[in-house]
Amino acid sequence: MPKLKTKSGAKKRFKITGTGKVLYAQAGKRHGMIKRTNKQIRNLRGTSVMFKSDGDNIIKYFLPNG
């Protein structure tokens, strides 16, 4: 059986912490910012921790070596 390859799109979008959690960037900051409040824009900064069940699926299917 060949080795599983890491999906290159997932490699760019997700980061796995040392404890096995998956970090991702908040969506919704590409365009259309004029209609959002400053608080909404501020809350979209930085990274978030994915729910465990979703993060486990990301690791299993898209980042098998990560």
From Swiss-Prot:
Belongs to the bacterial ribosomal protein bL35 family. GO terms for cellular component: cytosolic large ribosomal subunit. The gene is rpmI. Coiled coil: none annotated. GO terms for biological process: translation. PANTHER family: 54S RIBOSOMAL PROTEIN BL35M (PTHR33343), LARGE RIBOSOMAL SUBUNIT PROTEIN BL35M (PTHR33343:SF1). This is Large ribosomal subunit protein bL35. InterPro entries: Ribosomal_bL35, Ribosomal_bL35-like, Ribosomal_bL35_CS, Ribosomal_bL35_sf. It comes from Methylocella silvestris (strain DSM 15510 / CIP 108128 / LMG 27833 / NCIMB 13906 / BL2). One of its GO terms (molecular function) is structural constituent of ribosome. Disulfide bonds: none annotated. Keywords: Ribonucleoprotein, Ribosomal protein. SUPFAM superfamilies: L35p-like. Gene3D superfamilies: 4.10.410.60. It holds the Pfam family Ribosomal_L35p.
